């Protein structure tokens, strides 16, 4: 806990004579200044819409050049024109009288470049310059400890650049408490009231026994460098935004590893990541954006856990839209691995997820356009009011539903660990599967829609529930299959076939329970095997649909010793128990412990002896709305 003392020592009172954080106005300076920098602008919304409403600011097109200026990425400096500060124990010397020194506190008031070297046992570097000043601090093998405040405090400036000199190793730390020195609530090792950029080819270690690692009350930009941060609270915190172009990060925190939040402006408080390598271990969220969260690329290893049941422990979290365009993610969380309180779009990326709650969850619309998603253990795999899969390879092992479309939200989290999500039957809830390869191993419903279920392409394989209280397929409204491959095996008590609006043949049969590992096969009347697949679980019913099933033809289904022949008088054979049975997406209530999944991925990929023409996933348009099932003519061979 941060201990902010109100009693000032005589030393600090003296320092305040030089470091009072005034609202400085523009004035001419004599020191060498930085290059002219263009103004950074926030991203704007393109106005694209999706089913479901949200008041959150949700930009859909972002230009990376709007996120970073040329100066943000510039790591060079002219040493001959720079002011040199030498730190030594409890004293500081400067090559210029433009720096005010009081004991172990140096105050910089003039625009320019300052090179710091050496070590301070207990001191501060303060920037208190004009509100137009751009100041560069070069850390060249610097160690600064501040027992009662920030090691670096930006009180006033237009923008400050902290550059890690090439090959340098730098350490900044706080001693475990913060003493108030002005009206600002300083609570981090690096604390900035102004825009702050970090870059360079060196290393920065930050140890915050209390408070946060790095805080900017405006924009926090990191363009390059290596950062090892251990903080009692947040690791990186930006009020207006966190923007990361590149870098290597190892962050261990008592709260969120990355945290951005601006309660006064819904267009701010966002996190944008263009790339980098991230190893995040948090007792809160891995990343928490009060606005939107957009990841272009990068490598992410995220672990969250805590004994505090009231704390959110998600991997990636956004109050606004969450978009992933690429990257490699290994996420192990107690709460949702990837979560948006609004809409979410996954355009690409490789995900390996273990979670005690949902794998990928959106309170509104979830769209998967591509990527490789493996959810080894979860409560529910994919969840949103509307779930749309246009392409990709998805493997889900769930203790409840594999894919769930339902109204409501779970902003408080912990559907699996602490009880069901706050969902109810919703006519707006829909699942659209238009392409890709989906393997589901679910203890609850394999695919569960509180509204409608539409399959237009792709391949879907479900090792469904062994309990008769759930079904491999469950929907409350209507369903249809117009393309693709579907094999869904599970218990027979709640078994459902696809609906009468289907334009391709679909068969539901029930039989005596077959052992796990028993192969299901479909053959035509000439004995040609059309498709075969092996379930990882016991089952007593199966739904099979492929483009090869046509009206008027006869087919043989085998499952272990069971064999039956069916004649397709219509495109739908066997309706099951009716329209949905128990309401789909009923909030689960499985409520059990964190799942101990076996990593099973919903059976083995089927062995097909024909070319399955008509099975290539559709070439979807790029507007990412994903909300209306297309009129499919193409083939659907998967990814």
Question: How should these model regions be labeled?
Answer:
Residues 2-639:
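A composition-driven surface/loop motif
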